Each structure stands twice: as structure tokens, then as C-alpha cells.
Amino acid sequence: MTKQTEYKRKPEWLKIKLNTNENYTGLKKMMRSKNLHTVCEEAKCPNIHECWAVRKTATFMILGAVCTRACRFCAVKTGLPTELDLQEPERVADSVVQMGLKHVVITAVARDDLKDGGAAVFAETVRAVRRKNPFTSIEVLPSDMGGVEENLKMLMDAKPDILNHNIETVRRLSDRVRARAKYDRSLEFLRRAKEMQPDIPTKSSIMVGLGETREDLIEAMDDLRANNVDILTLGQYLQPSKKHLPVLKYYPPAEFAELKEIALSKGFSHCEAGPLVRSSYHADEQVRSAKENTAEAK
């Protein structure tokens, strides 16, 4: 048995019960009727049934459903993106009202075809949601937008409640996992975001199971803390298709618990770690915890 086939069968802790109720079907119909996309669907998130059916939350994916990059872990379509939909910010804001969300996550495909990386539409979406939902906290999860400081500033000036940007993997594996994104550029993006808006919590996420070592993960944690990242999420990488990178290890829950303790000892204000944890998983609880810790620090 080869190393690649050794881990084909998912362990018991990754088997989930699909809970499809009227909340789930209702949200799906609403998204289609408003021509909106969610990363929950496009990235084949394993938590979609819990979030949609039980928690009634969703992560909106703006700027279209086609990404200009082809990261080897990601299920989102790659190709030539469609034209910008300038009405999308208002539709997202209306959907947040209709869903009654207390916390919303807004992410996007990478738009390297645009000079601003999609920052203008991203910022307008934040403002539109804020106008119509003044009591809803807003988390943004952008690409690095080409590493252009002006693009990041445009987004940060819209004053989201939390800035999330994922390094996805450890330094040693970064070029293989996401060739068109750079590890150090992502760290710089996170550092600049904190410098621009010191009171806005920053967050990043790492997938495990791609061949990283414990030492690699500790190095990544140290890199994030050195750039003042507040929140860390750690989750199991799951291969979307045979075309994507294989899973080399399934981490048991106990190992995630150990990694969480290490992360908290490094100074992260909050760490969500577990086999099915994704960047937006329990995002409302993460931002609340970060703000409480920030208030205590003051």
C-alpha cells in the first residue's frame, strides 16, 4: 500500500450527519433567486449543512464564481472571470437582512484581472451591508489583491469588524499548494491590515494533512504572531477531487487539541481547531472572543 492510498478512507471523526431542513432549502433557493454565490457551496465545505440548516449562517462569495488562480487544494472554478456585477453589494446586503444574520462573512474569488483586485466592490459590499444591517458584525476574507497596499487600504477604510486572510499552509509547502500566492506576501498583507486599523482583529487559517510537520506548524504560528495576527483556525484538508493534492495525513481530534493549546500559548486571542474547522466556522464566536480579549487588554 502506498503512502498516497494509505489514507484514502476517511476516519470516523470526519463522518458527518447531513441535516437538510427548511432553513437549508430556503437559503439555497434565496441564493439562486438573487444570483449570489457562497463559498460554502463552491468550495464544498463539509459544514454547509450545519451552518445552513442549524445555525442559519452563510459565507457570501462575491466578484463572481470563477477564480483567476488555480490553487491545488481548492474546489472553486478557475478560468476567465465574468464582468463585475455592480449591483452585487446591494443584493448581498438585502440577503443579510432577509436571513437576519448577526454576523456575516464576505469572501471573494481572486481577481488578478482587475487593477484593484476587486477591492472597490469588496469595500462597497461592506458599506452596503452596514447601511442596511447596522447591528450585524462583518468579517471580510479577501485574496491578497496582488499585494498592492492601496487595494488593501480601500478595503480597510470600509471598516469591517474583522479582517481574515489565509496563509492556508506552512512556508515549506506554500509554493506547491498555492503557486500564485506567496507566503511572505500574505504575512505582509496581514501586517499592513493591522497597521492601518489597529483595533480591527486579524485572522488566518491553516489546513493540515498536506505533509507538514509539527515544527512547520509551530513556525507558521510564530510567523503569524510576529505579524500581529489575533485569531487562528486549524482544520483538516480534504481532497475535493482526484485532480487536487492528496491527503497525506488525517489528524485525530486529540492532535487538534494539542495544536490549539500551542497556538493559545503563542498569544493568539482565539484558536478554533478541529477536523471539520474551516476559516468561517463559528466565525461569530471567534470575533466575539477576539473583541472581548482586546477589551480586557486595554
Curated annotation (Swiss-Prot):
Main location: cytoplasm
Binding-site positions, [4Fe-4S] cluster 2: C67, C71, C74
Pathway participation: Protein modification; protein lipoylation via endogenous pathway; protein N(6)-(lipoyl)lysine from octanoyl-[acyl-carrier-protein]
PROSITE patterns with a match to the protein in the record: RADICAL_SAM
EC number: 2.8.1.8
Swiss-Prot/TrEMBL keywords: 4Fe-4S, Cytoplasm, Iron, Iron-sulfur, Metal-binding, S-adenosyl-L-methionine, Transferase
Enzyme kind, highest EC tier: transferase
Catalytic activity: [[Fe-S] cluster scaffold protein carrying a second [4Fe-4S](2+) cluster] + N(6)-octanoyl-L-lysyl-[protein] + 2 oxidized [2Fe-2S]-[ferredoxin] + 2 S-adenosyl-L-methionine + 4 H(+) = [[Fe-S] cluster scaffold protein] + N(6)-[(R)-dihydrolipoyl]-L-lysyl-[protein] + 4 Fe(3+) + 2 hydrogen sulfide + 2 5'-deoxyadenosine + 2 L-methionine + 2 reduced [2Fe-2S]-[ferredoxin]
Residue ranges annotated for the Radical SAM core domain, each copy included: 53-269
Cofactor note: Binds 2 [4Fe-4S] clusters per subunit. One cluster is coordinated with 3 cysteines and an exchangeable S-adenosyl-L-methionine.
The keyword Cell division belongs to this UniProt entry's keyword annotation: no
SMART domains for the chain: Elp3 (SM00729)
CC per GO annotation: cytoplasm
Pfam families (UniProt xref): LIAS_N, Radical_SAM
Cofactor(s), by name: [4Fe-4S] cluster
Location within or outside the cell: Cytoplasm
Molecular function as annotated in GO: 4 iron, 4 sulfur cluster binding; lipoate synthase activity; metal ion binding
InterPro entries: Aldolase_TIM, Elp3/MiaA/NifB-like_rSAM, LIAS_N, Lipoyl_synth, rSAM
Positions annotated to bind [4Fe-4S] cluster 1: C40, C45, C51, S280
Protein family: Belongs to the radical SAM superfamily. Lipoyl synthase family.
Name assigned to this protein: Lipoyl synthase
Species, as recorded: Bacillus cereus (strain AH187)
